[in-house]
């Protein structure tokens, strides 16, 4: 019914309930019934409404709430006044969002260049990543100082930027990039998922691929080796859904058809 609910720790107002008290069971955030999509970072939340507006709340140390300041908010506050937001993905301390015109925007922590601006400056308001209008599916991930973005374009190409540690950007190196860089030359990518120290993606043929840190066997290659270029997980072609969350550190998950 498009209502929004939250529970758990609330020291920075990340539950959006107007206070900082812990909740041990689900509590409705306001009374609205027009919430469409939700993403959460570390102690903050950001959500899209059916009218195309974007709202954020919780911790705001790096400006990740997009308010032009670093003040924390314990109730949802609108990000600007636009009604053209279409998708949103939260990393640990930053946000990546897409508009209906196919542009992508970022703000918050930028220690590893994850804002895609060609620098490592933090931004407390949305800034456009390049000038392209052909971005399709977005994902954001990474930890405290190693944020990453993974995005598929409408032409099926895959692009990544941010921290390159463990080869997590898929460029056959461990270099960090502060602007989008294409992963290989393929045009068959469909669904991305940026984790904490690794990435996953599904191709249009239903195969599942991964790269980055292999610690704990999270790349499903039968070992704990790091891979700096995409490697296929098994031989199946029936993978369909990746997690909407992008904060996974030690585990990989996917759903088959």
What do the PLM-derived regions correspond to, one by one?
Residues 1, 34-37, 50-53, 84-87, ...:
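Tandem repeat domain/solenoid detector
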Residues 29-30, 79-80, 129-130, 183-184, ...:
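Surface loop/turn motifs at the tips and blade-to-blade linkers of beta-strand repeat domains
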Residues 5-24, 57-74, 107-124, 161-178, ...:
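Short glycine/serine- and acidic-residue-enriched loop/turn motifs that recur at repeat junctions
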């Amino acid at each position: 019914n498009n209502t929004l609910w939250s529970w758990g720790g609330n020291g920075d107002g990340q539950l959006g309930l107007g206070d900082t008290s812990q909740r041990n069971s689900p509590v409705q955030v306001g009374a609205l019934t027009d919430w469409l999509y939700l993403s959460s970072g570390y102690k903050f939340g950001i959500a899209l409404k059916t009218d195309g507006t974007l709202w954020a709340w919780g911790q705001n140390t790096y400006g990740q709430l997009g308010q032009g300041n670093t003040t924390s908010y314990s109730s949802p506050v609108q990000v600007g006044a636009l009604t053209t937001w279409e998708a949103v993905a939260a990393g640990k301390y930053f946000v990546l969002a897409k508009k209906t015109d196919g542009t992508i925007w970022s703000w918050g922590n930028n220690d590893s260049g994850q804002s895609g601006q060609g620098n490592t400056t933090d931004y407390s308001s949305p800034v456009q990543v390049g000038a392209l209008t052909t971005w399709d599916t977005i994902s954001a991930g990474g930890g405290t100082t190693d944020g990453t973005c993974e995005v598929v374009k409408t032409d099926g190409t895959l692009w990544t930027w941010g921290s390159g540690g463990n080869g997590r950007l898929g460029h056959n190196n461990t270099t960090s990039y502060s602007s989008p860089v294409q992963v290989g030359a393929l045009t068959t990518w469909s669904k991305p998922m940026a984790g904490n120290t690794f990435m996953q993606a599904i191709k249009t043929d239903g195969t599942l691929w991964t790269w980055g840190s292999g610690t704990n066997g999270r790349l499903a290659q039968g070992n704990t080796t790091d891979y700096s270029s995409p490697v296929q997980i098994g031989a199946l072609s029936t993978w369909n859904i990746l997690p909407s969350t992008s904060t996974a550190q030690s585990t990989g998950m996917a759903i088959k058809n």
